Amino acid sequence: MTAVDFSAAMLERARAKPGAKAVTFVQHDAAKPFPLESAAFDRVFCCLVLDHISELDTFFRELRRLCRPTGCVVVSVMHPAMSLRGVQARFIDPGTGRRISPAGHAHQMSDYLMAAVRAGLKLERVSEHAADAALVARSSRAEKYLGWPMLLLMKLVPGGPGDYSPA
């Protein structure tokens, strides 16, 4: 298992988790080609990153390059509808305690889907997840988003008309 993150502090938090000894951690800017071998992974997970990537075509080609032909790519991203509410990703840096609002890029759902297709990935499943009463019960701050889609999930598999060709 390999985990990649831009933030050294986030990687340090991950290294402290149970089972971390079995994980290879790589600090890397996801806007650049990954320093990993082609077709090295059965499953490629991309979690809450896409809204920080300006060039989706290049990024999805990289996800496709890393995935074995029989594997899958699973993507989670803040739902594009959240940008209509003025919501941008933000977090507290565990190393400094400072509030961080990384640069974001407003993409539409079709931007994500078409970049994946152009990269040679086929959509196998897509789901949208809205704030509900259970979420509000866990976090009262979510009440203002009740009923709004907050998360977009996609399962993609290699194949399709994309222009991907392994190097």
Regions found by a protein language model. Give the residues of each.
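Hydrophobic residues in well-ordered beta-strands that form the structural core
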Residues: 3, 75-77, 125
